[in-house]
Amino acid sequence: MIRSIKGDLNSLNIKYKDNNFIFIPSILLLIIGFTVHYFFGFEAAIIVELPLITFILIALLFHVYRSVEKDLEEERTQTQAIQSIYTFITPRYPLPSMSRWTAYPDLAETIVRECMTNKPKLVVELGSGISTLITAYALEQHGENDAHIISLDHSQEYTQKTQDLLTVHELETKAQVLYSPLEPTQVGNKTYSWYNIDRLTTKDTIDLLIIDGPPVKTNQLARYPALPLLFSKLSKECIIILDDAARPSEQQAVRQWLREFPGFKQEYISNKKGLSILRRTR
């Protein structure tokens, strides 16, 4: 029953932002109603409040309609991205679901397209998961024989989960997941909580860098250290994909990267969580 109620609320798109939209007008209505009733009586309060209530209800319906319309458009976009992924790769087994706490389909589709177009030999990913699996498939089916992905994850649990997922899909030779706990790391004159990259000992340069970690709550500008710390390992044609680029902290990180490493230009994709793609300028 509880699940059913939650589903009905979700279908009406009642969210935190909607509660904010409803709360302030409701308080104003109460204040106006009590004020008019106090000075002019009940009938006057009804005459004043009815048009206001009607207006607010119409505005609320329009607000919910626009919000639902936006969500439906986003669902269509994600569905199209999933269809594209299944067009580009042929999984041996069904792919896990892609949602809020995993890579969204539009991120996965972007990664697959970059793998197909640029055929990277080495992909390094910060934060493992379904994107690791899909990238491994893309490298196996569209890349060079020795193309592979190395994924760093600060969580031992998710490191194992991703490795198990790769084993089920028979992709162990195309992907490696390294447990890399976060530790104090000096970048410039600031200390960040960032991956221990001592195990990233590959001699190959990085052709595609996917930044989907560490979590934003670990520290301010949590993902900024990626470029300063890995810049020397990037190939001359390296492409960088930053997920969650709609966040102010990620936008600030990109601005600092472009200022400190002027050899890159940014392409911003305004999707569910925002994507920034940095390419070297020639």
Short names for language-model regions:
Residues 53-175:
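Internal alpha/beta domain cores that form substrate/cofactor-binding pockets in large enzymes
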Residues 120, 205-207, 237:
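Local beta-strand N-terminus motif with an aromatic residue
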Residues 203-213:
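Short SAM/SAH-binding signature in class I
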Residues 215-282:
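C-terminal substrate-binding/active-site "lid" region of AdoMet-derived donor-dependent transferases
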